Every structure is written in structure tokens, then in C-alpha cells.
Amino acid sequence: MIVSVPLINGKYSAISMIAVRKHEEGVYNIIWGFYDIIIDDISQLDELVKNTPEIFCTPFMICGMTYHDLETGRWKVIATLNMNLTNVDLDDESLRKQHYDVIRPGIPLLEMYLGIRPWNEFYDPEYLDKILLKGFSKPERAWYK
């Protein structure tokens, strides 16, 4: 499932629901994929999904995150895709421990990657560096406060 995410600068991005994993008894963790997407108008997301669905095969980050904003309607479902992730093996135990057994503040991290928030917004200025997936690094647009 691809959903639109409003950003603090008035633009939009998209994230994908990759999986639902049992975290502990009665508690489930939604695994989300994050992408290098920033657009002005939500209608552009429809075109992006239709014309370049392969963009959703290589997230720069995955993490566990709640779905409250989806339930409240803040995030809109754009499409349902059968995604074959090319850079993530959801059965990899080390990825599970590092990336999706942990609930993270995903949208602020997305905004840091997109250059909307400062890269060093958290206490650990290298926090985001440590959780980017293999093959991804700090983008040139990153800035510091």
C-alpha cells in the first residue's frame, strides 16, 4: 500500500506499508518503506505510481511506525502495489533488529532525508546515518542547524 504523507513545508511524499509483523503478544508492528520523493501536489503521486512503480522497490530506510495518521485520514491511500523490494530482505535477522523491531519517528526522519529538517535534529547528529539502508548515504541537500 502506498500512502501520501503531508510534509511540514506543505509538500508531499509517499511511504509504503511493507509488512505487518507480530512484535509481541497482541502487539503488531507496521513496517514502512521511505523513498526519496518530494512533490508539490498530491495528484502527482498518482502519476508517479502509474508511470514509475519501480521507484517503490528501493526504500532508503525502513522502520516500524504506527498507522494513526492513516486511521485519521491524514495519510491518504494512493495505490496498492505488489512490491518486490530489491534492497531489503524482510527475513534477515540483523535487519529486523536494527530497522523494524523499533518504532521510530519516521516522518521527521523522512523530512531530514529530504532536506526539510536539519540532519542533526536529534540528540545523536548521526542518528539517521546509522539507519539508512545499504547503498544510501546522506544526500547533498542535507543541512545542519
Please place each PLM-identified region on the residue numbering.
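Short coil-to-beta transition motif at edge beta-strands of beta-rich domains
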Residues: 1-7
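Conserved beta-strand and immediately adjacent loop positions that scaffold enzyme active sites
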Residues: 2, 14, 31
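Intrinsically disordered, low-complexity coil segments
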Residues: 6, 22-27
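Residue-level signal for short segments within beta-strands and strand-turn junctions
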Residues: 7, 19, 34-36
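Short beta-strand-centered aromatic/proline hotspots
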Residues: 11-21
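Short solvent-exposed strand/turn elements
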Residues: 25-51
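Beta-strand-rich cores of mature extracytoplasmic or soluble domains
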Residues: 47-145
